[in-house]
């Protein structure tokens, strides 16, 4: 046990950055409502950073902050602010001004190629081959998510498609984030804090005991979450 009441440690978190391209709060509010409706499991009440670098017109920051907060998103900071007056308004509200890392120079565009003939659509998959640590949030939009290592407690996996975890699953797994009720979750060692498919969820104490710590497959059957052995 530490002898001091506090301890400072470096850490990193995965946050969504909302780039504002419109200075009208009502327009931003509606655009965010539409976006949240597409992936509520990922975006509802999510902490976000607002990037204001693209705003050229004067901004009513109080109204803008209220418009964003009214959607349920939690603004934890602002980046890309170069206007001194706007920066003062933001800081007056108690929000930190965040400095982003330097952006890499864009790569030259590849030479145009003739379109391939008779191509077959491919379903993309996001692959994570490193451990997912506590505090990390990984989202796979419009595709499946495969993790080949362990997922720590406090980590969160979100996918619009299926989720596969080939390691110990101690965090949270939310498949079908955009509402697809045909998605499934596959784990080789199910010890999750929460599992969810299209909004139907179990907390850890709701996972049947005979499947806890075992290889398991979860899916919806008649709109109810079910689990079976993963053979």
From Swiss-Prot:
Residues 102-125 are annotated as: Disordered. Pfam families: MinC_C (PF03775), MinC_N (PF05209). Gene3D superfamilies: 2.160.20.70, 3.30.70.260. SUPFAM superfamilies: Cell-division inhibitor MinC, C-terminal domain. GO terms for biological process: cell morphogenesis; division septum assembly; regulation of cell division; regulation of cell septum assembly. InterPro entries: CAP/MinC_C, MinC, MinC_C_sf, MinC_N, Septum_form_inhib_MinC_C. Keywords: Cell cycle, Cell division, Septation. The keyword Cell division applies. Interacts with MinD and FtsZ. HAMAP family: MinC. Belongs to the MinC family. Cell division inhibitor that blocks the formation of polar Z ring septums. Rapidly oscillates between the poles of the cell to destabilize FtsZ filaments that have formed before they mature into polar Z rings. Prevents FtsZ polymerization. PANTHER family: SEPTUM SITE-DETERMINING PROTEIN MINC (PTHR34108:SF1). This is Septum site-determining protein MinC. The gene is minC.
């Amino acid at each position: 046990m530490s002898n001091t009441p506090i301890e400072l440690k470096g850490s990193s978190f995965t946050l969504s950055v909302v780039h504002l391209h419109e200075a009208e709060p009502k327009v931003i509010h509606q655009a965010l409502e539409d976006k949240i409706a597409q992936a509520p499991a990922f975006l509802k009440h999510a902490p976000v950073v607002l990037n204001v670098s693209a705003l050229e017109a004067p901004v009513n920051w109080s109204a803008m902050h209220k418009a964003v907060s009214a959607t349920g998103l939690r603004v934890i900071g602002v980046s890309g602010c170069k206007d001194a007056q706007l920066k003062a308004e933001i800081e007056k509200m108690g929000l930190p001004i965040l400095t982003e890392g330097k952006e890499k120079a864009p790569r030259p565009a590849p030479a145009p190629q003739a379109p391939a003939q008779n191509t077959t659509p491919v379903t993309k998959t996001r692959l994570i081959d490193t451990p997912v640590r506590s505090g990390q949030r990984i989202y796979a939009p419009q595709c499946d998510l495969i993790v080949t290592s362990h997922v720590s407690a406090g980590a969160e996996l979100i996918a619009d498609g299926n989720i596969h975890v080939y390691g110990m699953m101690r965090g949270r797994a939310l498949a079908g984030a955009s509402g697809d009720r045909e998605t499934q979750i596959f784990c080789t060692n199910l010890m999750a804090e929460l599992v969810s498919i299209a909004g139907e969820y179990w907390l850890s104490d709701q996972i049947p005991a005979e499947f806890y710590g075992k290889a398991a497959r979860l899916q919806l059957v008649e709109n109810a979450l079910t689990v079976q052995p993963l053979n």
